[in-house]
């Protein structure tokens, strides 16, 4: 179930991302920069822990976690969140919670691409990545 996600991915398309990061509460200038960045994402698994590294010219982030166990994360926009990542129906589901708020990041593989659907309240952004 995890294997299709493993590897390095590059962003090839992004829909409604500015509205999503606005809904997260990201201020105007960093929001504009975030929309211009085309990050790469590397996902690995060592049998016990999963690692997700996201990198761009502006910022690199890395999380290391056990599936199904909550962990603390500092996001690319510097939010301090509690995250929980699980697998459901072939999708990797990440829920981030902070200050009474919640966002869901759903990753799935569609036709060899990784499709990432980010939802905050009623705002949805879809970002598509191709394997490098």
UniProtKB/Swiss-Prot annotation:
GO terms for molecular function: long-chain fatty acid binding. The keyword Transport applies. InterPro entries: Calycin, Fatty_acid-bd, ILBP, Lipocln_cytosolic_FA-bd_dom. The keyword Transport applies. One of its GO terms (biological process) is long-chain fatty acid transport. The modification Phosphoserine is found at residues 13-14, 40, 42, 44, 91. It comes from the Eukaryota. It holds the Pfam family Lipocalin. Its main location: cytoplasm. CDD domains: FABP9. Testis. SUPFAM superfamilies: Lipocalins. It is found in: Cytoplasm. One of its GO terms (cellular component) is acrosomal vesicle. Keywords: Cytoplasm, Lipid-binding, Phosphoprotein, Transport. Belongs to the calycin superfamily. Fatty-acid binding protein (FABP) family. PANTHER family: FATTY ACID BINDING PROTEIN. This is Fatty acid-binding protein 9. It comes from Rattus norvegicus (Rat). The lineage of its organism: Eukaryota, Metazoa, Chordata, Craniata, Vertebrata.
């Amino acid at each position: 179930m995890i294997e299709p996600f493993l590897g390095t991915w590059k962003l090839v398309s992004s829909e409604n991302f500015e509205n999503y990061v606005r809904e997260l509460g990201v201020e105007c200038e960093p929001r504009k920069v975030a929309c211009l960045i085309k990050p790469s994402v590397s996902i690995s698994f060592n049998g016990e822990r999963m690692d997700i590294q996201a990198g761009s010219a502006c910022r690199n982030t890395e999380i290391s976690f056990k599936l199904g166990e909550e962990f603390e994360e500092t996001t690319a926009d510097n939010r301090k969140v509690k995250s929980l990542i699980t697998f459901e129906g072939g999708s990797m589901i990440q829920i981030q919670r902070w200050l009474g708020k919640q966002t869901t990041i759903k990753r799935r593989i569609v036709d060899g691409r990784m499709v990432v659907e980010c939802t905050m309240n009623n705002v949805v952004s879809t970002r598509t990545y191709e394997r490098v």
